């Protein structure tokens, strides 16, 4: 019968086994993955940070103070490392690059700092009596030419009155000024002038030893950041770049301050490259980068001499005294063939943006001298050159050109200004002291700044381009177009099949994530409650440290004029703090997750497919770290929070397990150290009871002696007297005995302990009650005595105040009487003296009468 039942149920049993096997196979196929932390992954994000400088300052003259303060920069790396990032495409945008703004602010600060200790020329804002300097052509010099002669009135010989080293004394002095540096005063006959910027700016004279020679500056990123460089040879400045490398510093950038023409910059590696934020917007500047430089040689033939004028105590003004030799105009020379070839290549590139158009170059449409002319610094003097000959040509579609032809050399007439409107900000001007001797300099034109005339491009077939400039950001942008700063994110999370071995305990109802207190919010909590917020406190403590460092840096920046710190010094401090902040933040996160000192750290947090449903093999075999970070970017903070909760729960579990391990084995109860502790506790209890018995025995003896009894045995039961009306009887007598006054005779440890404890409580009660009564009595007595003393002192005060009043009245009366009596006596004496004087003639007459008689 049993065999038949087994055969009957075999079909159901076989189906159940098959279903169980399928479930096991499905569960095995759907393997679980866990979050794994990786430290040092190649991941970055766009960021802005403080850059610091590196320079080969030692390779230049150390006696001359360079305005760029490159002596405060760190030395350049002799072997710079550049790592090419293969299979990486990164977006660059030269028009929205924080590096450009940062360099612009740095150059402004460096100019301001270099002029801080220099002399203010406010005393020179006086009336100048000027005449034209006589210009005579030296015919014996064969090199002189008509074009080179300076125009009449280009140099003014001005006399003026200035304060000497003694403030209340004034003397007359003279100096030579350029026509561009002075303006005539209204309603005069062109003989009275003033300095050009006196009505709008504060003029500061550049210190005599300040040099404006551009020294290459390398911008570097602090630790924790990287600089990406685009190596595409035809990169237009914005958009994706496929040839990317990472560097720590830029190439050497010369901070050349110039307009219209870019000097001594970097060249394009292949064809000429033109860059603009928007070619269809004529308000946007077009930056042209040449692939071959054009040499420009500039000369100031005049041999100037200068003199030192005292304009007050401790202040000196350096003026031009005289011009020796030919007074010829400063000029620059450019090869016409090279310049035309350069323009032809520029036209080819412009036609790619403006198809079927005639390209015309024309001179500047007007504005400040810095914009209208090509301004730059040559040997310490600021040249302003007329570039009309450079930009005066038309290039038609067929390739022909209509321009000014001439000899092989293009000569640009230049003027020199000594009072320069500072390009950094309005309201500041600088006076460049004259340079003695002749000046020559040679520069390389590596780029142009162009602007396009407006208008509807469909109505005209000609696009007119003019030289531009003035915004020095375009100068820096022409060098920094290939760089961008990124923040390295070395911590990455990804799913793996490995799980961290953990201590398994039942989860509590309240999670750690529900407790978010401030850094000091748990100060009043219990130790157990405060330990829950240790992670939050660690994070807030780090942000507090960083905030403190930032506050210190702001304080240093506010006092840099007292500490004599340059801009580069501030940036180096900031770079070091940023590096420390980055390192501490990463190490803090790794420590919070229990991964300190590890590069690969497994966790017990399961991977959720909602974060990314890609398989582990697909992730690790087909994706880069940058692609993976973009995939899970929205869930990174949530994963970090889960890792923190998991590690906190793990630490709690380990703590509770360690607490249970102390009682895991009963054998620990019989450990010799525990027994010694038990014995010590027993001895302390017994000793305390014995001491208590001794104290009560002494107190009982003292109490009995005070009552007239002899100190008998502590436990002997003594009968009490019956009183005078009840005589003692015998044991055989009947009747009830009176109660005894002594305590009962007890046996045993617990009974003795109870009696002693009861007696102690009664003793303390009576003692405290008596003490309270005594204190109450003392307070009452002191209150009564105090009130009586107060009344006594009050009566005494009233008595003595009345006595003092009476004494004062008596004293005043006596004084008045004495004064009155004294006054009467004085009056009588005066009267007697007057009578005596009045009676003198009478006495004389009487004496004469007696003598005659």
Swiss-Prot record:
The record marks 508-509 as: Cleavage. Residues 659-680 are annotated as: MPER. One of its GO terms (biological process) is fusion of virus membrane with host endosome membrane. Residues 718-740 are annotated as: Disordered. Disulfide bonds join 53-73, 118-207, 125-198, 130-158, 220-249, 230-241, 298-332, 378-441, 385-414, 595-601. Residues 571-589 are annotated as: Immunosuppression. Residues 459-468 are annotated as: V5. Residues 385-414 are annotated as: V4. Residues 703-853 are cytoplasmic. The chain crosses the membrane at residues 682-702. One of its GO terms (cellular component) is virion membrane. Residues 158-198 are annotated as: V2. Residues 364-374 are annotated as: CD4-binding loop. The keyword Coiled coil applies. Residues 298-331 are annotated as: V3. SUPFAM superfamilies: gp120 core (SSF56502), Virus ectodomain (SSF58069). A motif (Di-leucine internalization motif) lies at residues 852-853. The keyword rRNA-binding does not apply. Glycans are attached at residues 87, 129, 134, 138, 157, 189, 199, 232, 236, 243, 264, 278, 291, 297, 303, 333, 340, 356, 362, 392, 396, 402, 444, 456, 608, 613, 622, 634. A motif (YXXL motif) lies at residues 709-712. Inhibitors targeting HIV-1 viral envelope proteins are used as antiretroviral drugs. Attachment of virions to the cell surface via non-specific interactions and CD4 binding can be blocked by inhibitors that include cyanovirin-N, cyclotriazadisulfonamide analogs, PRO 2000, TNX 355 and PRO 542. In addition, BMS 806 can block CD4-induced conformational changes. Env interactions with the coreceptor molecules can be targeted by CCR5 antagonists including SCH-D, maraviroc (UK 427857) and aplaviroc (GW 873140), and the CXCR4 antagonist AMD 070. This is Envelope glycoprotein gp160.
């Amino acid at each position: 019968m049993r065999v038949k039942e087994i055969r009957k149920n075999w079909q159901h049993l076989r189906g159940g086994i098959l279903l169980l096997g399928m479930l096991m196979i499905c569960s095995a196929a759907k393997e679980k993955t866990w979050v794994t932390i990786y430290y040092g992954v190649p991941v970055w994000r766009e960021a802005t940070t403080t850059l610091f400088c590196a320079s080969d300052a030692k390779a230049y003259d150390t006696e001359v103070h360079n305005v760029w303060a490159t002596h405060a920069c760190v030395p350049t790396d002799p072997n710079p490392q550049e790592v090419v990032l293969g299979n990486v495409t990164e977006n660059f945008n030269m028009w929205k690059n924080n590096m450009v703004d940062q360099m612009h602010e740095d150059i402004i600060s460096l100019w301001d700092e270099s002029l801080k200790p220099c002399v203010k020329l406010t005393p020179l804002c006086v009336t100048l009596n000027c005449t034209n300097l006589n210009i005579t052509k030296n015919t014996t010099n064969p090199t002189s030419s008509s074009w080179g002669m300076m125009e009449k009135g280009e140099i003014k010989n001005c006399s003026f009155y200035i304060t000497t080293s003694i403030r209340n004394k004034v003397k007359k002095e003279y100096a030579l000024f350029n026509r561009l540096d002075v303006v005539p005063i209204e309603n005069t006959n062109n003989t009275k002038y003033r300095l050009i910027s006196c009505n709008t700016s504060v003029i500061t004279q550049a210190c005599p030893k300040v040099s404006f020679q551009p020294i290459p500056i390398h911008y570097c990123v602090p630790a924790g950041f990287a600089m990406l460089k685009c190596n595409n040879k035809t990169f237009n400045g914005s958009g994706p770049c496929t040839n990317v490398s990472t560097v720590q510093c830029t190439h050497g950038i010369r901070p050349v301050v110039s307009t219209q023409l870019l000097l001594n910059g970097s060249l394009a590696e292949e064809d000429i490259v033109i860059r603009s934020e928007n070619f269809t917007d004529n308000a946007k500047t077009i930056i042209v980068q040449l692939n071959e430089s054009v040499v420009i040689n500039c000369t100031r033939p005049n041999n100037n001499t200068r003199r030192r004028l005292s304009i007050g105590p401790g202040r000196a003004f350096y003026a031009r005294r005289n011009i020796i030799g030919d007074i010829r105009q400063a000029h620059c020379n450019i090869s016409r063939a090279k310049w035309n070839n350069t323009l032809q290549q520029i036209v080819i590139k412009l036609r790619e943006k403006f198809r079927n158009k005639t390209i015309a170059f024309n001179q500047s449409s007007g504005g400040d001298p810095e914009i209208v002319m090509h301004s730059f610094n040559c040997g310490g003097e600021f040249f302003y050159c007329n570039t009309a000959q450079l930009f005066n040509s038309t290039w038609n579609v067929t390739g022909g050109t209509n321009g000014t032809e001439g000899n092989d050399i293009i000569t640009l007439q230049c003027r020199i200004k000594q009072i320069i409107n500072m390009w950094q900000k309005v309201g500041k001007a600088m006076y460049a002291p004259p340079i003695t001797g002749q000046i020559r300099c040679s520069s390389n034109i590596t780029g142009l700044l162009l602007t396009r005339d407006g208008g509807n491009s469909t109505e005209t077939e000609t696009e007119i381009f003019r030289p531009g400039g003035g915004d020095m950001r375009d100068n820096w942008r022409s060098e920094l177009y290939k760089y961008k700063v990124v923040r390295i994110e070395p911590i990455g999370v990804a799913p793996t099949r490995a799980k961290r071995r953990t201590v398994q305990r039942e989860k509590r109802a309240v999670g750690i994530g529900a407790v978010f207190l401030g850094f000091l919010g748990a100060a009043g909590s219990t130790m157990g409650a405060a330990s829950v917020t240790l992670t939050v406190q660690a994070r807030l403590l780090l942000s507090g440290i960083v905030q403190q460092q930032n506050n210190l840096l702001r304080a240093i920046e506010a006092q840099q004029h007292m500490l004599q710190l340059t801009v580069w010094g501030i940036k180096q401090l900031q770079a070091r703090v940023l590096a420390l902040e980055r390192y501490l933040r990463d190490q803090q996160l790794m420590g919070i997750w229990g991964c300190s000192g590890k590069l690969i750290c497994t966790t017990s947090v399961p991977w959720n497919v909602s974060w990314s449903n890609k398989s582990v093999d697909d992730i690790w075999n087909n994706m880069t770290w940058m692609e993976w970070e973009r995939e899970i970017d929205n869930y990174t903070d949530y994963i970090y929070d889960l890792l923190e909760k998991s590690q906190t729960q793990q630490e709690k579990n380990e703590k509770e397990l360690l607490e249970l391990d102390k009682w895991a084995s009963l054998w620990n109860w019989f450990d010799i150290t525990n027994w010694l502790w038990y014995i010590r506790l027993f001895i302390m209890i017994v000793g305390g009871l014995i001491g208590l018995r001794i104290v009560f025995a002494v107190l009982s003896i003292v109490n009995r002696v005070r009552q007239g009894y002899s100190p008998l045995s502590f436990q002997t039961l003594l009968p009490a007297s019956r009183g005078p009306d009840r005589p003692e009887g015998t044991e055989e007598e009947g009747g009830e005995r009176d109660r005894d006054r002594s305590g009962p005779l007890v046996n045993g440890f617990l009974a003795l302990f109870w009696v002693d404890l009861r007696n102690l409580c009664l003793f303390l009660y009576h003692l405290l009650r008596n003490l309270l009564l005594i204190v109450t009595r003392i307070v009452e007595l002191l209150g009564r005595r105090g009130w009586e003393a107060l009344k006594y002192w009050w009566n005494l005060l009233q008595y003595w105040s009345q006595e003092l009043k009476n004494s004062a009245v008596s004293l005043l009366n006596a004084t008045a009487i004495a004064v009155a009596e004294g006054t009467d006596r004085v009056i009588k004496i005066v009267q007697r003296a007057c009578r005596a004087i009045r009676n003198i003639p009478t006495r004389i007459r009487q004496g004469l009468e007696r003598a005659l008689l």
